[in-house]
């Protein structure tokens, strides 16, 4: 998995163009060795603590450059996309940018495909920060908060630091997000996201005005099209179960970091924690 990410990220880079920090958090496989095998501009940090926000903070402490781009290890983003994000921030006018997510549905069951068909029609699909696995911050933007707090929804925490006019999703570039293959894995991943959202709203209610538009009105409009009804039923079914699961865990303070191994292939060994790269 990390080889796929780093190859796409670094292919064609000019000397000294990138400073890439890979933080292997709780990894028990060969992730660190694979990352080091790429050589410059990759730097690798290892920590025994399998905690994403801890990894983000470690990476931030050693990262040298701005704009600073945060990339989940299980998505694919090309060098041209990285350049586009950096160039947009350098032009000014916004503080945070992200690419638009492209969901790779290879190997996914029909219900999963139906779910993402509906998702891509909703306003939240246009929010790259928190959906694409990639976001870029200017130096001024990074000063908006201190360390990443120990929250599940770290990317949403970043997004709500900025008003709508301070952030932008670039529709001309994309990140490839690998969707879970089965509906059970999809529900688990959605429940994790919902848990993070509920937790963030509880801990930082003062930031919630920056969350962005909801999906309810757009979702209701889709019901005007009978050809979408079956897909809408699946979407609503997944969302209802995920929200219920997340609320129960929040009530009992019982969070489990749900990981989708179906979209990771051999790289997603059950005992390995995914690294975060910056």
Whereabouts are the PLM-identified features?
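Glycine-rich, basic loop-to-helix element that forms the pyrophosphate-binding segment
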Residues: 33, 46-63
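Acidic helix N-cap motif at the loop->helix transition within catalytic regions
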Residues: 1-3, 29-37, 80
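Conserved donor NDP-sugar-binding/catalytic core segment of glycosyltransferases
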Residues: 79-110
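Terminal low-complexity segments of carbohydrate-biosynthetic enzymes
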Residues: 179-180, 188-278
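A conserved acidic beta->alpha catalytic loop
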Residues: 8, 24-32, 49
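Short beta-strand/loop segment that forms part of the nucleotide-sugar
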Residues: 6, 17-26, 45
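Short aromatic/hydrophobic "clamp" motif used to bind/position activated sugar donors
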Residues: 68
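Short, well-formed alpha-helical segments that are part of the catalytic scaffolds
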Residues: 1-11
